[in-house]
Each structure stands twice: as structure tokens, then as C-alpha cells.
């Protein structure tokens, strides 16, 4: 069964000024594929960002700004953490919220993991190409691909559902994945049952679990979605339209993007 973690029900732990909510843990999802924390930092405070041996991860700024290992980060950035990374994230002059994700024993998900860059890699996702659904106004921006991160141990994207849009029902084979709701509200159809999701909620899907999303509100419903491992097969339910993505030729600010991504069907995105 899918797991839903409600952000407003998570019990934060105070640690040297920071408040940490453990959203996805082995106890919650029943395996150690992924760990996910939501961290709130008052202005000017800091928290440790460290990985255990064999672990890789990433950090995304949801609100505010900060500095990690000399790299300035804002809500435009996701930073990817190599093996053995240890550092401190220092919040800027405003209260800051981050997502901190970790993949233990990452080599089991990518036999070429040694080729992943050994230094910190940060991506300004607002410069990445915006893709639009072939069937409606949904938008997609890739956040983590082998071309961006240097590993296929995980894959990530941000998806926006404008009012009145919906995704066809499907499931995945070969990977598990989660959605963290960044903005708005939407409905997740999980094996035919409706579940309301709001900003701050996390949905974790295992393999072979049919799911779809609908936005029946008057505001955009936006979530980030990460797969572990990255490669997987997407299987569409009978009668569902394949979810294909078209290039728009612009980035999130309407400018020319830093690279080109062509038309492709979801799940058939190797080499991006």
C-alpha cells in the first residue's frame, strides 16, 4: 500500500536551532531505499549535512536561502552530494526550509556509481527546459538525470498541474518513488481511491501500485518527484493515454534553456 506522510502531522525534532522532521525513514516505508527530512532553520542558523559511507544524496531549498560548502543556494537550486560528503548548511537572513534526501548503499542502484562526480554539484533547475504534456497544460522540469547528476541511482523532476488537469493512471516497475507537494492541493487516485494532498505532504509509491493525479482546485498543484533507482518501466492502465512530453523551447523564466530535451514518453527518458 502507498504511504502518505502528512507534513502538518510530522513531529519535528529540535537540534541546535534547527527543527528536523523525518518524513521518510525505513520504519515508515519498510525499506532503506531513501531517507527524507524536512529541515526548518531560523535566519542565521546552521545544520550539519553529512552522509554515511556508501551514501549519496541531495538538498533542495524550499524557502529562503543559504550556503553549503561555499556554494550559495536559493529556491532555484538543488545540490547533489557525493560519497562521503560532510558539511554545514548555513541559512541566510531569512527563515529557511530545505529537503534533505539520502540514498544509502547507492552502488546497488548504479553499477557505474564510481563515475559520479566526487565534488558538490548544484543545478539551477529554473534554467532547465520546460516540457508540456501532449494532452493538457501540465508542465515538467527535470531536476535529476544522469546528465545532470552523473548517476542513475535516482531520478527527479518537478511537475505542475494547472487547474483542471489530470494524469492518466499508471504504475512503475523497477523503482519506487515519492512525491513531495511543494505548492497547492491535489487529489491522488491510489488504486481507485481518492486521497487529498496538500503542500508539505509526501506520497510514497511502491512498484506495481496504480496511481494518478487530478487538480480540481483553482490554483496550481506542484510536486517534486524522485525515483530510486532512476531507470524504470512505466505501465499505463487499460484505456489510458500515454503521457508524452513536448519541448516548449523555454525555461521557467521564459528564456532559452541551457539544453534541449526532445519529445519523449514518460519512462522512455534514457540519456536525458
Where would I find each of the regions flagged by the language model?
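Short acidic-glycine-tyrosine-enriched beta hairpin
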Residues: 58, 69-86, 192-209
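A contiguous, mid-protein "functional segment" used to position or interact
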Residues: 202-253
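A short hydrophobic beta-strand segment most commonly corresponding to one strand
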Residues: 38, 80, 94-110, 158, ...
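A short, N-terminal "cap"/entry segment at the start of jelly-roll beta-barrel domains
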Residues: 1-33, 48, 75, 95-153, ...
Amino acid at each position: 500500500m502507498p504511504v502518505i506522510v502528512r507534513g502538518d502531522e510530522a513531529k519535528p525534532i529540535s537540534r541546535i536551532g534547527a527543527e528536523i522532521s523525518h518524513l521518510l525513514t525505513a520504519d515508515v516505508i519498510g525499506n532503506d531505499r531513501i531517507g527524507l527530512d524536512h529541515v526548518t532553520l531560523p535566519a542565521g542558523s546552521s545544520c550539519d549535512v553529512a552522509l554515511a559511507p556508501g551514501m549519496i544524496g541531495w538538498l533542495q531549498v524550499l524557502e529562503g536561502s543559504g550556503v553549503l560548502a561555499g556554494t550559495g543556494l536559493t529556491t532555484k537550486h538543488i545540490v547533489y552530494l557525493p560519497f562521503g560528503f560532510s558539511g554545514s548548511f548555513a541559512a541566510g537572513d531569512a527563515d529557511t526550509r530545505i529537503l534533505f534526501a539520502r540514498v544509502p548503499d547507492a552502488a546497488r542502484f548504479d553499477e557505474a556509481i564510481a563515475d559520479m562526480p566526487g565534488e558538490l554539484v548544484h543545478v539551477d533547475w529554473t534554467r532547465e527546459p520546460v516540457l508540456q504534456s501532449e494532452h493538457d497544460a501540465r508542465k515538467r522540469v527535470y531536476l535529476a538525470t544522469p546528465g545532470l547528476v552523473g548517476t542513475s541511482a535516482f531520478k527527479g523532476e518537478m511537475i505542475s498541474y494547472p487547474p483542471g488537469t489530470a494524469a492518466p493512471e499508471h504504475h512503475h516497475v523497477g523503482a519506487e518513488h515519492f512525491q513531495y507537494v511543494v505548492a497547492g492541493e491535489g487529489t491522488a487516485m491510489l488504486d481507485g481511491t481518492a486521497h487529498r494532498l496538500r503542500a508539505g505532504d509526501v506520497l510514497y509509491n511502491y512498484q506495481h501500485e496504480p496511481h494518478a493525479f487530478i487538480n480540481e482546485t483553482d490554483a496550481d498543484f506542484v510536486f517534486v518527484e524522485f525515483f530510486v533507482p532512476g531507470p524504470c518501466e512505466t505501465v499505463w492502465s487499460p484505456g489510458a493515454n500515454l503521457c508524452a512530453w513536448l519541448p516548449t523551447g523555454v525555461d521557467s523564466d521564459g528564456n532559452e534553456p541551457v539544453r534541449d530535451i526532445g519529445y519523449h514518453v514518460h519512462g522512455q527518458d534514457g540519456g536525458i
